[in-house]
Amino acid sequence: MKPIILMFIMLTIFMGTMLTMISSHWLLMWVGLEINMLAIIPILMKKISPRSTEAATKYFLTQATASMLLMFSIVINTANSGQWGITNMHNQLTSLVTMAALMMKLGMTPFHFWVPEVTQGISLMSGMLLLTWQKLAPISILLQIFPSMNPNIILLIAILSILVGGWGGLNQTQLRKILAYSSIAHMGWMMAILMYWPSLTMLNLLIYLMLTITLFSVLNINTNTTTLTLSNTWNKTPMITLTILISLLSLGGLPPLTGFLPKWTIIQELTKNSNIMLATIMAIMALLNLYFYMRLIYSTSLTMFPTLNNMKMKWQFQQTKQIFLLSPLVILATLTLPLSPALLTLN
């Protein structure tokens, strides 16, 4: 893809997301979502192959279905209220359909089926864009309409997403699928706290974006896509491999790394609101995610996969991939926990 075309597509994606985030009119918000969806499809198919074509087709069909559901709920809501304002949603049916459409766009349970398959079929950097930037527009809508939604349904979706995100990643060896299931689980954590502290949802989203962008960027340096390729990079780039392992620990939520902050604050806030059982269930289910992160770290640092002797050592090719601002990203993804009092004060 030519750089000028890529720049135009990225600008279109940015404009579509910004249009959705700044709009208070349902029609403009829907148009922004559609611009965003149509513009990212060429990014998903940047490397022409049957797998990327299949992934882009699955993504388009799922997102088009979600867009139809969203437009259906918008039309019904406008017919009942006579207004296009996003906060004028008082019909229970329209709230339920809108929630289903947004959950499908975010890839949350029970509409999570497309996320691992699409992420596995595209490149690492396209997967990074799919699991980070594409979450912003739907979450910005949720932050505006959550008071009109049923809190019990939101909490049920959150618990199921955390469970599926942990359970689905247990037997995976493909790093992109593992990160896809991790994304599903993190979306569940964000939804669980949405009803009680929306600002904490935004902080959780910001930390998730930092961690995921850092991990994808570091994986892209050596083009690591499986556990096998990851385990064979110690001899080529040991510092990069160490950075990957620390980022995985942070994504799993272990102290004293940055990823511990959102889980700690969410569980604390749920406990303050007398949801001790919910906080306990979420903490237990988070162990599933931590298990497959630790399994990745164990297989990478303490074992060597059974390969041919002449394949164990990777050739020392000259490093050609340069990642902009990688060092600050790594620092933010691992060492931000001491700043947590200041971050919570901002909320």
UniProtKB/Swiss-Prot annotation:
Core subunit of the mitochondrial membrane respiratory chain NADH dehydrogenase (Complex I) which catalyzes electron transfer from NADH through the respiratory chain, using ubiquinone as an electron acceptor. Essential for the catalytic activity and assembly of complex I. PANTHER family: NADH-UBIQUINONE OXIDOREDUCTASE CHAIN 2. InterPro entries: Complex_I_Subunit_2, NADH_DH_su2_C, NADH_UbQ_OxRdtase_chain2, ND/Mrp_TM. The gene is MT-ND2. It is found in: Mitochondrion inner membrane. It is a multi-pass membrane protein. It catalyses: a ubiquinone + NADH + 5 H(+)(in) = a ubiquinol + NAD(+) + 4 H(+)(out). GO terms for biological process: mitochondrial electron transport, NADH to ubiquinone; mitochondrial respiratory chain complex I assembly. GO terms for molecular function: NADH dehydrogenase (ubiquinone) activity. The chain crosses the membrane at residues 3-23, 25-45, 59-79, 96-116, 127-147, 150-170, 193-213, 240-260, 274-294, 323-343. It is an enzyme of class 7 (translocase). GO terms for cellular component: mitochondrial inner membrane. It comes from Lemur catta (Ring-tailed lemur). Disulfide bonds: none annotated. Belongs to the complex I subunit 2 family. This is NADH-ubiquinone oxidoreductase chain 2. Its EC number is 7.1.1.2. Keywords: Electron transport, Membrane, Mitochondrion, Mitochondrion inner membrane, NAD, Respiratory chain, Translocase, Transmembrane, Transmembrane helix, Transport, Ubiquinone.
